[in-house]
Amino acid sequence: MSNLSRNAQVLRYLLEVAPGAGRIKLVKYAYLADCEAYRYLGRAISGFRYRFDNHGPFDRAFFDAKDELVDGGYATETAIRIGPYDGYDYRPTNQSVEYGFNQAEVEILRYVAQTYLNETAISLCEDVVYKTPPMKGAKVGERLKMDRMKEEQDPLGFDLERLLEAEASVDAGRYRPVKEAVDELRARHRA
């Protein structure tokens, strides 16, 4: 079991996939991962409780998780200038982390960070984050209703956890070629 809180684990994992992310992007990655987790797993990955802040979804608990990473030597925080603004660059250190995520959570975290890695913070917010169901119609200061993501579940009934279990089964050699299974069914039908 990890000695990091769940929220710190989420941020650290995202930094492994997207080193150099700033505060805004890091928080938005966590938010989007929680949105996808609600969609496919029916629950969040993190323990963040998002509110509509001045710059979109945010939870002040981010600072505790970030401080936990930096103070514990799991990430670096470097102050930088971005045009006229002060910003921060976060990077994972070489200190190993034992994550408490299941495979579906890992895939969601990786997917979000890789998918939005090249987005600027502005385009990430305007083109993606602000268009998510919890943000639609929300007012500044309100807690976001993350369960609205459940309304956007895959219409085909895609079950991420079952798919990953099947993939692991195939990787472990526990499968039968389709031709073999069909031939067996035909033989049973003829008998």
Predicted regions, residues:
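Domain-edge interaction signal
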Residues: 1-155
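Small, basic N-terminal interaction modules of short regulatory proteins
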Residues: 140-191
